[in-house]
Curated annotation (Swiss-Prot):
HAMAP family xrefs: CPSase_S_chain
Gene Ontology biological process terms, A to Z: 'de novo' pyrimidine nucleobase biosynthetic process; 'de novo' UMP biosynthetic process; glutamine metabolic process; L-arginine biosynthetic process
PANTHER family: CARBAMOYL-PHOSPHATE SYNTHASE SMALL CHAIN, MULTIFUNCTIONAL TRYPTOPHAN BIOSYNTHESIS PROTEIN-RELATED
Keyword Signal applies: no
Pathway: Amino-acid biosynthesis; L-arginine biosynthesis; carbamoyl phosphate from bicarbonate: step 1/1; Pyrimidine metabolism; UMP biosynthesis via de novo pathway; (S)-dihydroorotate from bicarbonate: step 1/3
Function: Small subunit of the glutamine-dependent carbamoyl phosphate synthetase (CPSase). CPSase catalyzes the formation of carbamoyl phosphate from the ammonia moiety of glutamine, carbonate, and phosphate donated by ATP, constituting the first step of 2 biosynthetic pathways, one leading to arginine and/or urea and the other to pyrimidine nucleotides. The small subunit (glutamine amidotransferase) binds and cleaves glutamine to supply the large subunit with the substrate ammonia.
Organism of derivation: Staphylococcus aureus (strain MRSA252)
Enzymatic class: ligase
InterPro entries, A to Z: Anth_synth/Amidotransfase (IPR050472), CarbamoylP_synth_ssu (IPR006274), CarbamoylP_synth_ssu_N (IPR002474), CarbP_synth_ssu_N_sf (IPR036480), Class_I_gatase-like (IPR029062), CPSase_GATase1 (IPR035686), GATASE (IPR017926)
Protein's gene: carA
Name of this chain's protein: Carbamoyl phosphate synthase small chain
Domain Glutamine amidotransferase type-1 residues, every copy: 173-360
Active site annotation, chain numbering: 248, 333, 335
GO molecular function: ATP binding; carbamoyl-phosphate synthase (glutamine-hydrolyzing) activity; glutaminase activity
């Protein structure tokens, strides 16, 4: 017999289901993800640190978990919510079940609940604090706790590397500032011949310049960009001296460093099917996204930044470039994993930008 578990929201509503994963019951911000596949990459994405993910696709876990598709060494989300979790996955690469991996990493979950109802609630009311309990009589107490608890402010500190390390390439040298990077960013750079040095988010502009890289990549990561003040100062210190490319949180920090402002979205963009229009080419890419904050488009008017991409669903800013300096960013995930690879040409654009900048510097110094 399956053990009962309850998902409780801060507004007092609750959902009865059955136990999935760990008994280490947690609280966090509940969000929803609309991707149909890629649950392993999703639960291991550091951008979900501290959050509870509701999967809108009704069956999760049907192809198991393998060791190669993790986007981080240790998942740092606070829970998952699914309609049905497969207990008997079938795939030639499968090594563990979803339940096994959640239990291993002390992540609780719940299955057998109406995920459509939960998703509608989040869409209507915005993201909420939520938690799990295995005892119905504890629900009222948990609601009070959720209404009072303060969630962590700086999740980047939890997931950023503590010491620099290198992923070897043969050509251009890139410093990747780790705000909670997905591993596929490193892979996309490596496959283009880049030697990647991953550094902590607290690394200063002076320390980066001393490494003399050909370019700087600002990674994705969790939480509110305004909290990561040290990175804003770092970006201001390297802008114009080295080409750089920002993704997701890196995109937001780039905008803030130039005087723009951000805002918390009602329920964010999380999924692998978000259409984005490239304003320079007129083309539309289907993109992978995972963010709960966005850049205020009106705040860009007094900056030297130009909007290059817009979300077709709600018109929010999805891409920026500096008007005169070699720097650009996107809000979505061109490295995918999960999701479509429509936009991985942006890594080629970054390599071309670094090569051109390096050649220009060579002529100036000749």
């Amino acid at each position: 017999m399956q053990s009962k578990r309850y998902l409780v929201l801060e507004d007092g509503s609750f959902y009865e289901g059955y136990r999935l994963g760990s008994d280490n019951l947690t609280v966090g911000e509940i969000v929803f993800n609309t991707a149909m596949t890629g649950y392993q990459e999703t639960i291991s994405d550091p951008s979900y640190t501290g959050q509870i993910i509701t999967f809108t696709y009704p069956l999760i876990g049907n192809y198991g978990i393998n060791r190669d598709d993790f986007e981080s060494l240790v998942p740092t989300l606070n829970g998952i919510v699914v309609k049905e979790a497969s207990a008997h996955p079938s795939n030639f690469r499968q090594q563990k079940t979803l339940h096994d991996v959640l239990e291993l990493h002390q992540i609780p979950g719940i299955a057998g609940v109406d995920t459509r109802s939960i998703t509608r609630k989040i869409r209507q009311h915005g993201v909420l604090k939520a938690g799990f309990t295995d005892r119905k009589e504890d629900i009222d107490q948990l609601v009070k706790h959720l209404q009072q608890v303060e969630l962590p402010k700086n999740e980047v500190e939890i997931v950023s590397t503590k010491t620099p390390y290198v992923s070897t390439g043969k050509d251009l040298s890139v410093v990747l500032v780790d705000f909670g990077k997905k591993q596929n960013i490193v892979r996309e750079l490596n496959v283009r011949g880049c030697n990647v040095t991953v550094v902590p988010y607290t690394t200063t502009a002076e320390e980066i310049l001393a490494m003399a890289p050909d370019g700087v990549m600002l990674s994705n990561g969790p939480g509110n960009p305004e909290v990561v003040e040290c990175a804003i100062l770092m970006i201001q210190g390297i802008l114009g001296k080295i080409p750089f490319f920002g993704i997701c949180l890196g995109h937001q920090l780039f905008a803030l460093s130039q005087g723009a402002s951000s805002f918390k979205m009602k329920f964010g963009h999380r999924g692998a099917n978000h259409p984005v229009k490239n304003l320079e080419t007129g083309k539309v890419d289907i993109t992978s996204q995972n963010h709960g904050y966005a850049i205020d488009i009106d705040s860009l008017k007094s900056t030297d930044l130009e909007v290059t991409h817009l979300a077709l669903n709600d018109g929010t800013v999805e891409g920026l470039k500096h008007k005169t300096l070699p720097a650009f960013s996107v809000q979505y995930h061109p490295e995918a994993n999960p999701g479509p690879s429509d936009s991985n040409y942006l890594f080629d654009d970054f390599v071309a930008m670094m090569t051109n900048f390096k050649e220009k510097e060579r002529h100036i110094n000749a």
